[in-house]
């Protein structure tokens, strides 16, 4: 599996690491992914999902079902 959020699709960002002498080198800024077991109320079951912490925060605010529908994700595949 790739290092991407299964709900939002967030993945690594290409950036630059800049030293004190201003030498720039390429660097990957990875997404903060967490494996979580969340209760899906509509499906009446637990779903194991690899999601970003930003998505987890949004789920706590609006709920798993509403957040998944707004991102066009079918929770039946988890």
UniProtKB/Swiss-Prot annotation:
Any one of the GO BP annotations: translation
SUPFAM superfamilies the record matches: L28p-like
GO molecular function: structural constituent of ribosome
One GO cellular component, as annotated: ribosome
Gene3D superfamilies: Ribosomal protein L28/L24
Keywords, alphabetical: Ribonucleoprotein, Ribosomal protein
Disulfide bond entries: none
Family matches, as Pfam families: Ribosomal_L28
PANTHER family, per database record: 39S RIBOSOMAL PROTEIN L28, MITOCHONDRIAL (PTHR13528), LARGE RIBOSOMAL SUBUNIT PROTEIN BL28M (PTHR13528:SF2)
Family indicated by similarity: Belongs to the bacterial ribosomal protein bL28 family.
Official protein name in the record: Large ribosomal subunit protein bL28
Organism of origin: Prochlorococcus marinus (strain AS9601)
């Amino acid at each position: 599996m790739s290092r991407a959020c299964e709900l939002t699709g967030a993945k690594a960002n290409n950036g630059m690491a800049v030293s004190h002498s201003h030498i720039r080198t390429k660097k990957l800024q990875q997404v903060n992914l967490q494996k979580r077991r969340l209760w899906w109320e509509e499906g009446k079951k637990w779903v194991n999902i690899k999601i970003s912490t930003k998505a987890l925060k949004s789920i706590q605010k609006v709920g798993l079902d509403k957040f998944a529908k707004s991102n066009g994700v079918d929770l039946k595949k988890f």
